[in-house]
Amino acid sequence: MSVQKVRVERKIGDSVLSFETGHIAKQAAGSVLVQYGETVVLVAAASGTPRPGIDFFPLMCDYRERLAAAGKFPGGFLKREGRPSTKEILSSRLMDRPIRPLWPAGYKDEVQVQACVIASDLQNDGDVLAMIGGATALHISPLPFKGPLGSVRVGKVDGKLVAFPTADQLEQSELDMIVSGSRDMVAMIEGFANEMPEDEMMEAIGFAHDAIREVIDLQEEFYKKVNPEKTPYQSPEDDGLLQRLTDAYYSDFKTAQQTSGKQARAEAVRAVRDRAMADVIPDPNAADAVCVNRFKSVWHDLEEKVVRDLILAGTRPDGRDHNSLRAIHCETDLLPRVHGSALFQRGETQALITIALGTSRDEQRVDGLQDEYSKKFMLDYNFPSYSVGECRPIRGPGRREIGHGCLAERSVAPVLPSADDFPYTIRVISDITESNGSSSMASVCGATLGLMASGVPISNPVAGISVGLVQDGPDNWCLITDILGTEDHFGDMDFKIAGTQNGITGIQLDLKVTGVTNDIIRATLKQSREARIEILKKMLTTIPRPRREISPTAPRLLRTKISPDKIGALIGPGGKNIRGIQETTGAVIEVDDEGTVLVASSNKESAQEAMRQVEACTATVQIGKIYDGTVSSIKEFGAFVEILPGRDGLVHISEMSGGYISSLDQVIAVGDAMKVLVIDVDEHDRVKLSRRKALEELGEEDPLAVEGEGGGDSEGGGDGEDRPRRRRGGSGGGGGGGRGRGPRRSGGGRDRD
């Protein structure tokens, strides 16, 4: 690519969107710097020669975020970015989906589109800019891309639709949706909402399309200034093989496609294909790979034609009409020990759900360009190869699994209770144990069942459905509810919509055609709602509402709020107090900087005991209140008594008893229980206690006063209450009494200092 520096810009939404090329990445087939606000994304497209024998279009879209774009360093030992994060994988999929259908039929050159966020203002996300940049880079490249294509993110803040909302606005938004499209049609939708009614969702899509047209206007202006030379692409010539196979095997193939059952249907189709292959290639072992791949490609086209013709004629492969759902089966509580489990089956698609409930220690920490945050809800989607009867290498989750998991997670999230109402960290695992279409929506339904079975108080149950499309011209099209894998593969659309009886929570549109009209979208929303309500009714016959109690095997969580200045008292010196509570009760205690204390235990009794000790440890000492204390240490001048966990007060020897006591360690011992009254808390938060006044207020006899009646010499005898008064006047009798007074006064002074 060799052009002079070109730049165009236009205000869209609240900021300026700009494209620039001819300055950076000039050797790429097409490159563009996209800027919105102070977020800048570099997008470059490149192309390679097709690999021999390839039978698919090898398009790869990749999105990355350089943390230096926000002035940050990657965490960990190696201070550089590694494998893509979940956010980067999801953004890569967003780039790919609207671009993929916009290529000539039969085009198999390798194409890569790479996007990198190189500056971020932390308000304008780079994902939608990468989508715009990917389409723009391809549009100004020599490649035969059928652009232009625009994208926009839409929010709804305070009842008003907003194009390109900032991160702060999205925090308050009831909608987060990205829409891609051409000037006349919508090409892709990915959105999440708080139970938004269908008519409001349709309004938001129309609003997004208006903004998309503004983006396309800017792309067209950019295209004219760059004025690229497009390389013409010649589609492969028709060798007549498709017509030959159609004439010979269309009828047999049509019959095979109407066989009931996925496995039986696949075997019937395979039998017809094997006969056709033997006709075209008598000796497959002697044929070259090009010939075999050509047959497979043409046979795929014939299969597509048969399936689409059947659907347009009103017949689906499994015999249903266009609006019917497959048979639905729901179960809960399949598994022991787990905190919740469910099974959702729709036809030959089956999702096994397990639920785990944990504490804040189990939250997932997420770091990226934005400030680090934690997630209290996670939904993991797994798609093992046995679910479709195949053997494949066993690896970690791929892009598809991460994408499906995110769709299901964000579709369920709006109905979850707040952390204040339900402090548990929630993990949902959806294992797809059988698959024949729409497994992500089965995960949504199964997750709802599992959450209700585990006692999570969701506000409304959520169900999901996928609606397909077969179109033969602008006026000949039909929608099909609850699509099979075959219908997904050969159809034109996979429109997944999840929600409650009140409205939509998740929406995802994928197309194999260049776009669909608003009429098709509106009809799909209406048809999907009817199916969703029917599914919800069947789910609620299995479990009508969330259980009131969580599983007996789940941790018991109790929560309280303490004053932040009491956090130190709870933790204690070196963690002594909090560690002691945990060791004696077996509970786990967590406290945050705001004073929220969470107590978790495997059983209710230990959690309650730990909470009692936490409350005692952080309670405020009240003057005039009587406490049941324990002697923690004895000095010559008095005794220290623990009245709350980790909180001691001093009972001066003069406040120990109404009688005379010559030596405290002769009448009390460490560990003795003692009732004391708080008489003062000084400015240094030191507590002064009185055993004598506590007993007087309670009207109880003081055994120490009785023991002290005979204390001292003859001069110190007499009434016990008179003796301390005489000693305070300096006329104490007896050497023992006099000797004891001096050190007590001295010791008391040292304590006060």
UniProtKB/Swiss-Prot annotation:
Species per Swiss-Prot/TrEMBL record: Rhodopirellula baltica (strain DSM 10527 / NCIMB 13988 / SH1)
Family: Belongs to the polyribonucleotide nucleotidyltransferase family.
InterPro entries: ExoRNase_PH_dom1, ExoRNase_PH_dom2, ExoRNase_PH_dom2_sf, KH_dom, KH_dom_type_1, KH_dom_type_1_sf, NA-bd_OB-fold, PNPase
Cellular component terms (Gene Ontology): cytosol
Biological classification of the source: Bacteria, Pseudomonadati, Planctomycetota, Planctomycetia, Pirellulales
Regions of compositional bias (Acidic residues) in chain numbering: 698-719
Gene Ontology molecular-function annotations: 3'-5'-RNA exonuclease activity; magnesium ion binding; polyribonucleotide nucleotidyltransferase activity; RNA binding
PROSITE patterns assigned: KH_TYPE_1, S1
Cellular location(s): Cytoplasm
Encoding gene (name): pnp
Protein's UniProt name: Polyribonucleotide nucleotidyltransferase
Any single biological process term in GO: RNA catabolic process
Cofactor: Mg(2+)
EC number: 2.7.7.8
